[in-house]
Amino acid sequence: ITNWDSHSDIADTHAMQAEIMDQPTAALINDMKRRGLLEDTLIVWATEFGRMPFLQGNGTGRDHNPEAFTCFLAGAGVKKGFSYGESDEFGYKVAADPVEVYDFNATILHLMGLDHERLSFYHNGLERRLTNVHGHVIKDVLAWSA
């Protein structure tokens, strides 16, 4: 088993990774739904970057792209069958509804019943919020009003 960090041979490695992830993830979600567990369970599938939309040098891989990538949420309180955000036609930059990491984390915390504005830590003598002062809940992905 390889990983998603495909600086070379992206076609084969991503095809293999997608096969490893696709059916088991769908089976997990369907099984949890069938057992009535999905309504109380939040599933988060995330990454910190995507891949560039063009090949790296003369190779067969792609470099990191921190500007546009995909994450998904399923289950407890997440709107079903919904896509939020959009990249440009090349998948290089965000074209609509950008989401910062702080927003994504604030939304996850909200779905877990936690007020992200009250969660903080001390660093260098300052109290800092986990979601910084910029993080906000992405209300459009919620199945109910926040």
List the model feature ranges, each with a label.
Residues 1-146:
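Ligand-binding pockets and gating/stacking loops
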